[in-house]
Every structure is written in structure tokens, then in C-alpha cells.
């Protein structure tokens, strides 16, 4: 059964399944009628988010080479166990159009199941990517079926599934990642910073400045130079990027990913601030490309320089050859209350 259901912000496609224990195997097959809503470039893995707090990553495959049948594998049994599914319950899956299915359960009386306490399953984040031709019959090389989400992502899921009592659709984030610990620690350890800070940089030398002594600095710098050279060949800088803005009159700048990934900072060039006479309130909304799922990320402006930006880079699975553009929503007096993030795939 498939239905184009109504989401909070937009119409998103849904499909429904009846859970029958005797007929349910190791995998979950999607209705063929739902194929028209799947992206042309199929993800190797998809995220299933339960409204009750659990998060799973499952493999997404063609069923035994059949181009019209798709299944979720390597994780469906875990979902059944974690949610304690009962025979005859209705399962609703809402697809965001790219890689995420929001999941809820209706009892036999067609009432949505609620849970008093939220349970968060922390999973591991690797093996992302796209594959059009990999079939269900192929051997799955990774023994890990789950992903690890950082504190920002888990906070987003919780806030998305809880009733919003504020007048604005704003999600307050947890503390930003600690730059001095490794990626695994970033994902699973409690953050020690006191607040989420946006830092507006007053340094224009964004592309070439090196920071600190790093054993891998030369390698990283050389790799980043290669990415920049390729972008220049494609003519992907300057006013050419204005075509990606929602409002072509807004100020914008292209993010230096080398700095964002390594130093977890969003740096706004002084020349942009000066040229347009920009200034900022105490709090600013950072609008993620996945806004329909996560809402606006509310962050505090402190001093002259925005921190904790790496979570958006991770959440959107941004690669070095992708382009990240920040569009500044400017009011008549130059006040910027919102920054829209656009991810352009390379």
C-alpha cells in the first residue's frame, strides 16, 4: 500500500506495510508502486528513523537482480526486535526523497503507537555512497549494520519528533564538536564546550592560510590544492555560484571545506561583510539543506568570528569535490538573521 502523505512542511511519499510474523523474513521489500519516488542514483544504505527515538542504517538493494523490486536488508530483524513489533500492526514509512525513511507504528485499532520514554540507538557512521547496479545477491562486505550519529544529529531527531511549543520552527542544538579529539570521540563522547558559537571571521585569506603544526598538513594541503584546481577548471567560483541562491540578490560565499572539516568553523569573509554592510543579532538561524527533517538550527553569535559547522558537513555527507554555498538572508538595514546552506554535488 502506498500513499502520498502530508508532512509537517511538505508532501512526502509514504508507503504502508502490515507486519505478519510468519511471512516476515530477514528483509523488508518495498511496494513496486513506490519505485517512482526513489532517486535515480540509488543509495547503498538508507536511514530508518523511528518516531520513538531509534535510528538504524540498513542496506538498500535490488531483490535478486530484479530491477523493479527493492529491499531493505541487514537490519530489518533488528528493527523488529527493537520496536517489539506485533502481528497485525501497520507500519508507516515516509521517504524524504534521498536516503531517509521516517517510521512509525499503528496498532490493530489503527491508533498510532506512542512511547513514554525516548530511546536513542547510537550507531556507526561509515560506508555511505551511491551504487546503481549493486544487487541484493552480492555479498555484503561490511559486518556493521549501523551508523554512529553525533550529538547534533541525535538532538535533531529528538527535536523533530517532539511537539514544538515555540512560535518559530527552531531547534536548539547541543554543544559543538571538540576539535581536539578524533572523529569517533566526536561522535560518542559528551561535548565539553559550554555553548554553540558562530564565529564571523575577519580574515580574508580563507583559501591559503595554514593553521598550526600538523603531521599531515602537507598531505592535506596538497590534496586540497588538487580539489581547488579542479574547481577552477570547471569555473565553479565567483559570481557563477549566484545561480544556486534562492534569492540572487542576497550576499553569499563559498565555504572552504578544508577549513570546515579540519577546524569545525564557518568563516564569513570580511570582504562580504564590508561590501554589503552586514551585521548580526545575538542569535542566528542556520538553515540546513535537510530543513524538512531537522528545522532551523539556532546558534549564538559571539564576538566576530560561527563554530560547530562540521555537523552539517557530516550530516549531508559532503565530499571534498562538492561545493557548499552559504546564502546570507539580508534585511534592508543589513541585518542577517538566517544563513541558508546549499550543497552542490561535484
Swiss-Prot record:
Record field: compositional bias (Acidic residues): 192-217
Keyword Cell cycle: no
Keywords annotated in UniProt: DNA-binding, Nucleus, Transcription, Transcription regulation
Any GO CC annotation of this UniProt entry: nucleus
MF terms in GO: DNA binding
Coiled-coil annotated residue ranges, if any: none
CDD domains: B3_DNA
Stored Gene3D superfamilies: DNA-binding pseudobarrel domain
Location of the protein in the cell: Nucleus
Pfam families (UniProt xref): B3
DNA-binding region: 13-109
InterPro entries (alphabetical): B3_DNA-bd (IPR003340), DNA-bd_pseudobarrel_sf (IPR015300), Plant_B3_domain (IPR050655)
Region annotation (Disordered) ranges: 158-179, 192-243
Basic and acidic residues composition bias: residue spans: 218-229
Name used for this protein in its record: B3 domain-containing protein At5g60142
Amino acid at each position: 500500500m502506498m500513499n502520498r502523505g502530508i508532512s509537517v512542511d511538505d508532501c512526502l511519499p509514504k508507503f504502508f506495510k502490515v507486519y505478519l510474523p510468519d511471512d516476515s523474513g530477514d528483509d523488508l521489500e518495498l511496494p513496486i508502486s513506490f519505485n517512482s519516488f526513489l532517486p535515480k542514483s540509488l543509495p547503498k544504505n538508507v536511514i530508518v528513523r523511528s518516531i520513538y527515538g531509534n535510528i538504524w542504517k540498513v542496506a538498500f538493494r535490488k531483490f535478486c537482480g530484479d530491477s523493479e523490486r527493492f529491499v531493505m536488508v541487514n537490519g530489518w530483524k533488528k528493527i523488529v526486535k527493537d520496536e517489539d513489533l506485533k502481528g497485525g500492526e501497520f507500519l508507516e514509512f515516509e521517504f524524504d526523497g534521498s536516503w531517509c525513511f521516517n517510521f512509525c507504528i499503528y496498532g490493530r485499532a489503527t491508533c498510532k503507537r506512542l512511547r513514554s520514554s525516548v530511546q536513542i540507538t547510537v550507531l556507526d557512521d561509515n560506508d555511505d555512497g551511491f551504487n546503481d547496479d549493486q544487487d541484493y545477491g552480492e555479498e555484503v562486505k561490511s559486518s556493521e549494520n549501523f551508523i554512529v550519529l553525533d550529538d547534533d544529529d541525535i538532538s535533531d531527531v529528538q527535536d523533530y519528533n517532539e511537539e514544538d511549543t515555540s512560535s518559530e520552527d527552531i531547534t536548539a542544538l547541543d554543544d559543538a564538536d571538540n576539535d581536539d579529539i578524533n572523529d569517533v570521540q566526536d561522535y560518542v563522547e559528551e561535548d565539553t564546550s559550554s555553548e554553540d558559537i558562530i564565529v564571523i571571521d575577519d580574515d580574508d585569506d580563507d583559501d591559503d592560510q595554514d593553521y598550526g603544526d600538523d603531521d599531515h598538513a602537507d598531505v592535506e594541503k596538497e590534496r586540497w590544492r588538487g580539489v581547488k584546481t579542479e574547481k577552477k577548471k570547471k569555473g565553479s567560483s565567483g559570481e557563477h555560484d549566484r545561480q544556486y541562491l534562492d534569492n540572487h540578490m542576497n550576499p553569499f560565499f563559498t565555504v572552504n571545506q578544508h577549513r570546515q572539516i579540519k577546524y569545525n568553523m564557518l568563516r564569513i569573509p570580511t570582504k562580504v561583510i564590508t561590501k554589503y554592510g552586514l551585521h548580526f543579532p545575538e542569535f542566528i538561524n542556520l538553515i540546513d539543506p535537510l530543513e524538512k527533517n531537522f528545522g532551523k538550527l539556532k546558534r549564538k553569535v559571539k564576538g566576530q568570528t560561527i563554530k560547530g559547522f562540521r555537523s552539517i558537513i557530516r550530516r549531508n555527507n559532503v565530499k571534498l569535490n562538492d561545493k557548499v554555498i552559504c546564502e546570507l538572508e539580508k534585511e534592508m538595514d543589513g541585518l542577517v538573521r538566517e544563513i541558508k546552506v546549499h550543497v552542490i554535488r561535484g
